[in-house]
Amino acid sequence: MTNAAQLTALLHLASPALPVGAFSYSQGLEAAVDVRRVADEASAAAWIAEGLDVLAACEAPLWLLQFADWQAGRFDAVAERDAWFLATRETRELRLETSQMGWSLNRLIQQMAWGDDALRSALAACASVTFPTAFAAAAAALNVDPRDGVTAYCFAWVENQMAAAVKAVPLGQAAGQRILFGLHAAVARAVEEATRRAACHPPELSTFSPGLGVLSARHETQYSRLFRS
């Protein structure tokens, strides 16, 4: 059971104030707005829910695997899976997004001296680290429960998508909060699915999201944009 210290650590990691630059990315949502795939509250909620399904199929179960390897000191396995995840990002801006956010969180872990020397040294030795790998390292360093940690990861992703929708569509603040509240159950389902996939032998990781890849590629040359992805 998560105690007060662990809960505080989770709230810290999931906070929009975490200095990783998440606010500057929309992960294709802005391109979806540009082509009118997302145009109002209902379509924004549907888009985010579909994106959460994609997250539950790859990034969230990978987070659980990375967390376990960080805790066990299997740093070679962490590096191998991290390289695989980066290779699955289909566009340049998606690769830059996860690399920049991972670098920023890695730097914060070093500055805050989270975790033991071995974990921080392994992170420092990485030429590049993706965001799920860095977030899993931070969660392991702060000794949070893995299920709670991946829940925080998924919720933070949903919250960032909601904030992007409020700016890009645009939507009112109340609409954004309705979207966020309406996706509470979807976050819980995503955690269940991620846990199931991570427990399979071999793990069931699926990166199939052709629509996201196409929209992200379009966004790279979009005439006017607010976000970096």
From Swiss-Prot:
<comment type="similarity">
    <text>Belongs to the UreF family.</text>
</comment>
<keyword id="KW-0963">Cytoplasm</keyword>
<dbReference type="InterPro" id="IPR038277">
    <property type="entry name" value="UreF_sf"/>
</dbReference>
<comment type="subunit">
    <text>UreD, UreF and UreG form a complex that acts as a GTP-hydrolysis-dependent molecular chaperone, activating the urease apoprotein by helping to assemble the nickel containing metallocenter of UreC. The UreE protein probably delivers the nickel.</text>
</comment>
<dbReference type="Pfam" id="PF01730">
    <property type="entry name" value="UreF"/>
</dbReference>
<dbReference type="GO" id="GO:0016151">
    <property type="term" value="F:nickel cation binding"/>
</dbReference>
<keyword id="KW-0996">Nickel insertion</keyword>
<comment type="function">
    <text>Required for maturation of urease via the functional incorporation of the urease nickel metallocenter.</text>
</comment>
<dbReference type="InterPro" id="IPR002639">
    <property type="entry name" value="UreF"/>
</dbReference>
<protein>
    <recommendedName>
        <fullName>Urease accessory protein UreF</fullName>
    </recommendedName>
</protein>
<dbReference type="GO" id="GO:0005737">
    <property type="term" value="C:cytoplasm"/>
</dbReference>
<keyword id="KW-0143">Chaperone</keyword>
